[in-house]
UniProtKB/Swiss-Prot annotation:
Taxonomic lineage from the root: Bacteria, Pseudomonadati, Pseudomonadota, Gammaproteobacteria, Pseudomonadales
GO CC terms, sorted: plasma membrane
Domain 4Fe-4S ferredoxin-type: 52-82, 92-121
Bilayer topology annotation: Peripheral membrane protein
Chief subcellular location: membrane
Protein name per the record: NADH-quinone oxidoreductase subunit I
Cofactor note (record): Binds 2 [4Fe-4S] clusters per subunit.
CC cofactor: [4Fe-4S] cluster
Binding site for [4Fe-4S] cluster 1: C62, C65, C68, C111
Function: NDH-1 shuttles electrons from NADH, via FMN and iron-sulfur (Fe-S) centers, to quinones in the respiratory chain. The immediate electron acceptor for the enzyme in this species is believed to be ubiquinone. Couples the redox reaction to proton translocation (for every two electrons transferred, four hydrogen ions are translocated across the cytoplasmic membrane), and thus conserves the redox energy in a proton gradient.
Transmembrane segments: none
Keyword Endoplasmic reticulum belongs to the record: no
InterPro entries for the chain: 4Fe4S_Fe-S-bd, 4Fe4S_Fe_S_CS, NADH_quinone_OxRdtase_chainI
């Protein structure tokens, strides 16, 4: 008989404790965000979707050096080099498979021209896996991205057709390294 009374008291105590816990949580701030209306906080260095940028002249920054594809630990980047009449390299095709990408940022670090940049965009959900394979046209943005004044060909010293090195618009004169010696 006393065993049954003890079980009843124990069960009632458990129910009361659960009710107190439920009502206590009802007055606290919620942990869940209503996502589309309330945007998620992203840290300043968040690595999201990859984009290809343009230089200040509006040309593609990518020179198809293939360093990004080599640096990628999962091998989700593929590209093919082509060359213009003036000798400038560009990617004939540039493809990233975002279903395999782990957003590590190694491709951005490996890029000598800052053509590849990671943006804070993370909304890339698709119903088909094939739709997560982005081509160059999908990745190329109209602006220069994080480095608006950088132009690889101005720094690299490639001569512009018809002008000597250092004579093109916004280009610095070449430095004579022998004059810097003591």
């Amino acid at each position: 008989m006393f065993k049954y009374i003890g079980d009843i008291v124990k069960g009632t105590g458990t129910q009361l404790r659960s009710l107190v816990m439920v009502f206590g949580h009802g007055f606290r701030k919620r942990d869940t965000l209503q996502y589309p209306e309330e945007q998620v906080y992203l840290p300043p260095r968040y690595r999201g979707r990859i984009v290809l940028t343009r230089d200040p002249d509006g040309e593609e920054r990518c020179v198809a050096c293939n360093l990004c594809a080599v640096a990628c630990p999962v091998g989700c980047i593929s590209l093919q080099k082509a060359e213009t009449e003036d000798g400038r390299w560009y990617p004939d095709f540039f493809r990233i498979n975002f279903s395999r990408c782990i957003f590590c940022g190694l491709c951005e670090e490996a890029c000598p021209t800052t053509a590849i940049q990671l943006t804070p965009d993370f909304e890339m959900a698709e119903f088909k896996r094939q739709d997560l394979v982005y081509e160059k046209e999908d990745l190329l943005i109209s602006g220069p991205g994080k480095n608006p004044d950088y132009n690889f060909y101005r720094v690299a010293g490639m001569a512009v057709a018809g002008k000597p090195k250092g004579a093109a618009q916004n280009e610095a004169e070449p430095i004579n390294v022998k004059s810097l010696l003591p």
